[in-house]
Amino acid sequence: MITRLLKSVREYKKPSILAPVLVSCEVVMEVLMPLLMSKLIDKGIEKGDMNYVWWMGTLLLVCMFISMAFGALSGREAAKASAGFAKNLRHDMFHNLQTFSFSNIDKFKTSSIITRLTTDVTNVQNAYQMVIRIAVRAPIMLIFARCASFYLNAKVALILLGIAPVLLLGLIIVFRYAHPIFVRMFKKFDVMNNVVQENVRGIRVVKSFVREEHEIGKFTEVNNSIRNDAVKAERAINFNGPLMMASVYTAMLLISWVGAKLVVNNEMTTGQLTSMFSYTMQILMSLMMVSMIIVMLVISKTSAERISELLDETPDITNPENPVMEVKDGSIDFDHVYFSYSKNKEKSCLMDFDIHINSGETIGIIGGTGSGKSSFVQLIPRLYDATDGDIKVGGVDVRNYDLDVIRDNVAMVLQKNVLFSGTIKENLRWGNPNATDEEMIEACKIAQADSFISAFPDGYDTYIEQGGTNVSGGQKQRLCIARALLKNPKILILDDSTSAVDTATDAQIQKGFAEYIPGTTKLIIAQRISSVENADRIIVIDNGKINAIGTHDELLKDNEIYKEVYESQKKGGEE
């Protein structure tokens, strides 16, 4: 895990190395100063040698300023390294996220991904900065200060040696108790983020159903749960503070008592005792730093594991070794295809799909909710891979195509229409970044979007709010259809993408398809018979199987499911 994360350091290796080197130099200066202070007291002050006092005092000041300079430089380099590391980590996570297939994305909640990219990265960044500074500073200071204390007086130094195991035991207890709590707490952060995200996204529904109190209750429940875990974790961590302070005061009292006896017996000088107090503080401070590092690592370990999960997730769908780079035409072949989201053929949502669709053919798809219509069309651009059987586009197995090539030649307008923050032009150019204004207008005319766009004060430069909240559902659908048309695809798939437009507009869109893109294979999933009745053929899907294929007239005559849907809609229209 650590090796995987450190790959994100990359161009920030230099500051990552410089920071600990500069910290080491800072520590050397800090450890040297108590020794100089000891000499200043014993040889200067006690003997009344003011020249020695001035000389040694100046040397102490020089050491202090050098130490400060090293400290400032190490802080700057550590900040540069940790911020760069976090930037690369976010980039690597987001880049890997873009390679995910739908099945990979299904493993993570949106709120969890956001938490990993923000909170978790910040935790790891703080830990990294602490490691390249404090984790270097603490052991070096501990070793140097301990060696210097033994050099001054071994008897007093042994007191400090006995305190370390007590502190180490405390740190182990804290780590073992706190880590599982932090793991649980970060999972609850995902739940809380999910509650907030759902509430913000569905705020209009919440308001219309007067469910504010219910939503507040959901948020309060998870918020209180996080608070309870945080209290438990802090309780464990706070145990470390009193233990540290008790150790510090115990050490100081013992050193004062033993040191005073040694000074009285002329076994130790006043300057050495003063320096010993300084080294005691340095040793105990370094142990406190180790304690801080342990606490930070407890928090960041959980975050690091969650980040690694996202970084180590490999896409289920990848390019073949020698991919086909051209789609010849829009013909589609399903050869006894089975598909299951769980990769278990026994739980297939598509079973024994066998069909040939000619290039340029218009295919209507009818079926009940959950019958497998969307699953069927999502296999064509290889958003998922079939569990069994073969799927061909243009006579070539879709698994042999370059992913970008097959998806560029298959335009999908999904059930959930998504518009991004930006102008209408910017949203349309998702279909073709190089599209001219004339091409955009033509696509919008086919999609019956040009009329309402032209009615906006800013026309095609109208700004679309996040999620397309300032356009209606029908307008959003037509913009998404126009965006798909700009790809100039060989296959166009509409997944119930005209459900929010009236039947007259729907008919105009179908007429535009027939007139302007006759060579494009068109697959139209619809709930309304009127949307597909003029298709070359209509597929009736029932419980994951092809129930019937035929023209509108043929199905109306021979298929009970189609006839039932038609009669119910006809009756509803008459009423």
Regions from the language model: what does each represent?
Residues 47, 83, 91-115, 119-121, ...:
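Short intracellular "coupling" helices and adjacent cytoplasmic loop segments at the cytosolic face
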Residues 33, 37, 58, 74, ...:
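Hydrophobic/aromatic residues in alpha-helical transmembrane segments
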Residues 11-14, 78, 99-103, 119-132, ...:
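An intracellular "coupling" helix at the cytosolic face of ABC transporter transmembrane type-1 domains
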Residues 1-33, 37, 45-59, 73-78, ...:
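Membrane-integrated ABC transporters
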Residues 48-53, 144, 148-162, 176, ...:
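Helix-loop-helix
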Residues 11, 15-28, 39, 60-63, ...:
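Transmembrane helices of ABC transporter permease
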Residues 325-575:
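ABC-type nucleotide-binding domain
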Residues 26, 30-34, 62, 67-82, ...:
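Alpha-helical transmembrane segments
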